[in-house]
Amino acid sequence: MAAIAASEVLVDSAEEGSLAAAAELAAQKREQRLRKFRELHLMRNEARKLNHQEVVEEDKRLKLPANWEAKKARLEWELKEEEKKKECAARGEDYEKVKLLEISAEDAERWERKKKRKNPDLGFSDYAAAQLRQYHRLTKQIKPDMETYERLREKHGEEFFPTSNSLLHGTHVPSTEEIDRMVIDLEKQIEKRDKYSRRRPYNDDADIDYINERNAKFNKKAERFYGKYTAEIKQNLERGTAV
């Protein structure tokens, strides 16, 4: 009887130990899941915070002027230049000479070539600047008519050089040659403008494989890139021998 009782005690203790181990294992797994859940929760909050910051920054960028990045870069460059000038002045050095030491020979040659150009294209900034550049280009093409100048000066005498009391406005009548020259120049400008925005003429004999103009442009683009790969398939479809 004593042996049986001892064996039952051992079995009970073993069962209790296994139950305790199982409970401890379950607690560890639950703790791992909770820790993983907390990590995911923190990651979600961090992602939400970053997304909100990105949305705010994008909204700020959209509200800024179109050329804000270029202006900002220009201002930063000017600030750096001012700081360098102050540093050189504090050291008693000539800023222009110090700046030349930092410029390579290739950059110096390129800069000199750019300075020698009569009407350099500095890139698009706004429509007013583009119009001003065109105005300078057109005025430089005007050739003075010295014969007409001398004739008008002899005709008007001292009044040819106007003062605050002169009343020459509306008295000049352009000649036929001047009007023709202006018309020719305007026609050249219109022709040049049409080359930049040339609309292709409509071909009545061309195959219609589109439903609207946008689809026609897409089909032309697809034909340009994939036409050589689909030529045989199109021919088989037209002959009726496609598999």
UniProtKB/Swiss-Prot annotation:
GO CC term, one of those recorded: nucleoplasm
N-acetylalanine: residues bearing it: A2
Superkingdom classification of source: Eukaryota
One Pfam family linked to the record: SYF2
Coiled coil regions in record: 66-91
Cross-link entry Glycyl lysine isopeptide (Lys-Gly) (interchain with G-Cter in SUMO2), positions: K143, K234
MF term (GO), any: RNA binding
Tissue: Abundantly expressed in the heart, skeletal muscle and kidney. Expressed at lower level other tissues.
Keywords: Acetylation, Coiled coil, Isopeptide bond, mRNA processing, mRNA splicing, Nucleus, Spliceosome, Ubl conjugation
Keyword Ubl conjugation: yes
Localization, UniProt: Nucleus
GO biological process assignments: embryonic organ development; gastrulation; in utero embryonic development; mitotic G2 DNA damage checkpoint signaling; mRNA splicing, via spliceosome; positive regulation of cell population proliferation
Chief place of localization: nucleus
Record-linked PANTHER family: GCIP-INTERACTING PROTEIN P29 (PTHR13264), PRE-MRNA-SPLICING FACTOR SYF2 (PTHR13264:SF5)
Role played: Involved in pre-mRNA splicing as component of the spliceosome.
Subunit description: Identified in the spliceosome C complex. Interacts with CCNDBP1.
Protein name: Pre-mRNA-splicing factor SYF2
Organism for this UniProt entry: Homo sapiens
Native organism taxonomy: Eukaryota, Metazoa, Chordata, Craniata, Vertebrata
